[in-house]
Amino acid sequence: MKRTYESGDKMIHTRGKAEGLREKLATILSQDYKELAVQDLKVIGTGVQNIVFRGDSEKGSLAFRVPWEREVENINEDLFNSRISLKKEAELSKYCHSKGISVPKIHGLHLSAELDFLISDCVYTDHMPISAHKIGELVSKLHNMPIDGLHYEQNIKEPISKYIAERIVKRIEGFNTITNCGIKLPDTKTIEHILSTTDDEKCLLHMDIRPANLIGYNGEVKAIIDWDNALIGHPLLDLMRIAETNEISWDEFKDGYKNDSIFNVTPHIVSLFYRLDTAVMLANLFIAHLKIKNKGVFYKERVKALHQEIYKNL
């Protein structure tokens, strides 16, 4: 869930909408999932795309992830399809669970005209902070996980360098529209050529590692959640997102990740483009969607600084 990105008491979706979804969920569970005997549905998390309810059941506490809408327009991406998102969450969580990566166990995926939702274990937290070192260890384990048996079809153009190049250009176009900055990048083909040096190394990337998406207990990571942004690609793409988002101590994280060589074998300009991909996404999010002024200003300046740095390294 993307709770961290919401501003103070500002609610993107109304309580009325949440109650309507809760009632629909309760009705379907009472009719189609009688064996679970789910009771006492309560909201435990709200994000940009989903709301999560907790309910007591015959299998213990369960979490129900319910999209706010089936499709959503997004300045940073193509049309967001929540059904694809739920399928992705279910598939990647099941695979990671089978490989010993900490994720909630998936119990079911319900898709219907009335409502879509994902059923998983409800993992509890004591809200004790998780050290960046431990997060680094976890991400290293994820990046080193074999993906030969992962039959996940990324809904993107191949190779990954083409997809990221096109995404950066699209995001910059949106950024220029809302800021009037007039940022100019090399053409898509040039960016793709620069990024293509990393196409051969592939692993599963979470692409949104931050405290809001890590459930911890007693300082240990109990579960990674929210695989909406996940990709298969070079680990540096995931690492630069973590660095640019800056919600985790970078030096401490790297100590836990234990692979400094990854930053030396890849051309610096690749890292800059990967950082730009995240910075412009956050600028667009905070300026146009969430309207959080100080963060919008910060990432607007980051985009401009990264743009200058990229041209110095071309």
Residue ranges, per PLM feature:
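An alpha-helical support segment within catalytic cores of ATP-dependent transferases
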Residues: 20-36, 145-207, 305-306
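Juxta-kinase regulatory segment immediately upstream of eukaryotic protein kinase catalytic domains
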Residues: 2-40
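Active-site Asp-x-Gly
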Residues: 203-204, 210-211, 215-268
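ATP-binding pocket architecture of kinase catalytic cores
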Residues: 42-159
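Conserved catalytic motifs of the protein kinase core domain
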Residues: 59, 115, 200-202, 220
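Active-site activation/catalytic loop segments of kinase-like enzymes and analogous catalytic loops
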Residues: 236-263, 275-294, 302-309
